[in-house]
Amino acid sequence: MQKSWLVLLVACLGLQGTTALTLHRRDLPAVVSLDIKRNNAVDPVARDRMRRKRDKTVEQNLDNEETLYFCNITLGTPKQSLRLVLDTGSSDLWCNAANSTLCSSRDQPCNASGSYDPSSSSSYAYTSSDFNISYADGTGAAGDYVTDTIHIGGATVKDFQFGVGYSSSSAEGVLGIGYTTNEVQVGRLGKSAYANLPQAMVKNGLIQSNAYSLWLNDLGADTGSILFGGVNTEKYHGELQTLPIQTVNGVYSEFIIALTGVSLSSASSHHNYSSSDALPAAVLLDSGSSLTYLPNSIVQDIYDDLGVTYESSSGVGYVPCSLAQQNINVTYTFSSPIITVGIDELVLDAGDLRFRNGARACIFGIVPAGDSTAVLGDTFLRSAYVVYDLSNNEISLANTKFNSTKDNILEIGTGDDSVPGATQVSNPVTSVVADGSGARIGGPTGEIFTDIPSATSSGGAAAPAGPTDVPKHLVLGAAAIGYVLAF
């Protein structure tokens, strides 16, 4: 594959505003491109709970296996290969130590994602024993912060800091690329931030600005990509529109924006939920969450209109798999930008699960948020092209262009209004309260991880029975039309 920019292929794989910006086109734009790949999660809700923690571009392809996105990197000298979960909702890169309690167990659960052996790397250096991340259900990892050389596609960053878990309950390491203020040593210990991956790329001259764009592609695609330091104009429709990121307790720590409208439409009907008392709402953009978590009242209305069966013990909504063939859209409004999600992107394979009438049951990609901040996870992000501009504390959105094979890479420059072709939304809603609650993938809970609760061979742990404080009447749904799960 020949390209005129620096490409790091790591198979991990209307409008009112200012005039659009001058495009930053160079023969050799500083970008880093990474492939990302999707992987299946047997129980996406349990997995979300377990992993919720609280002229320069780099592109990485993303591997897509329906409910989780991975990227492949190498660490150390010589190189040690790892497959990590890409997560915009956290900020630390961490991986399991080869001799960790979990990886050393009989069933060798770390084989698929790999592990890191510091003693085998000549470029390894110990930093501290401060790494300790705990998730909302008590799972987590503890160990050391270290530095070593990271290779991500064709780029190399030396003396890169990351966490190594010697005690862990997840076989899957995480590549967190959020704000440095959300790093474990900052949030839990009050220490100064270190340069995580996007910031380290800027520091090493690989990209100009601490910004990246994410293109997950559709549910049927195996791969997507993340482009550090640039945008790919062939991956979205229309224009990018820019919104301010909301602070949490006065600090920029998570990718939270204001959701102002939600609607459901088909060829024959339209249901608008924008009058709900739950809107406008603070919503977190989180690639580490498989599903989308919306305010309870909105989910109740959607479930009623679609006939979704809510199973309270697992916290999952189920629909007939045939629903994916219907011409139905869920539309999200963010002051001005409108992102449309087709129903086929919200109907997820649940294996051989069936309703009592024999119809195949699929997981519905929207579930109640309970008391936690609403989360726009992968069932939303696949339909949106998102630019995360950490330098300017802004998010730019457009509707994704599915299965595009063309590329037009433009570099994100420095300073204000640096995202190519993006326009600022005039008078965006900002009056939303973001509490940063919940340990989404990576979001530290502030608790210390001290024990490993019954890890499975895949690194999973038993999940709570259901979402916190979800109305019991959600259990109804499709039972009224004969769709009752057969257990």
UniProtKB/Swiss-Prot annotation:
Its EC number is 3.4.23.-. Its main location: membrane. Residues 69-398 form the Peptidase A1 domain. It is a lipid-anchor; GPI-anchor. Residues 464-487 form a propeptide. It comes from the Eukaryota. A lipid is attached at residue 463 (GPI-anchor amidated alanine). CDD domains: SAP_like. Residues 1-20 form the signal peptide. GO terms for molecular function: aspartic-type endopeptidase activity. The active site is at 87, 286. One of its GO terms (cellular component) is side of membrane. GO terms for biological process: proteolysis. Gene3D superfamilies: Acid Proteases. Keywords: Aspartyl protease, Cell membrane, Glycoprotein, GPI-anchor, Hydrolase, Lipoprotein, Membrane, Protease, Signal, Zymogen. It is found in: Cell membrane. Glycans are attached at residues 72, 99, 111, 132, 272, 329, 403. Belongs to the peptidase A1 family. Probable GPI-anchored aspartic-type endopeptidase. This is Probable aspartic-type endopeptidase opsB. It comes from Aspergillus oryzae (strain ATCC 42149 / RIB 40). The lineage of its organism: Eukaryota, Fungi, Dikarya, Ascomycota, Pezizomycotina. The gene is opsB.
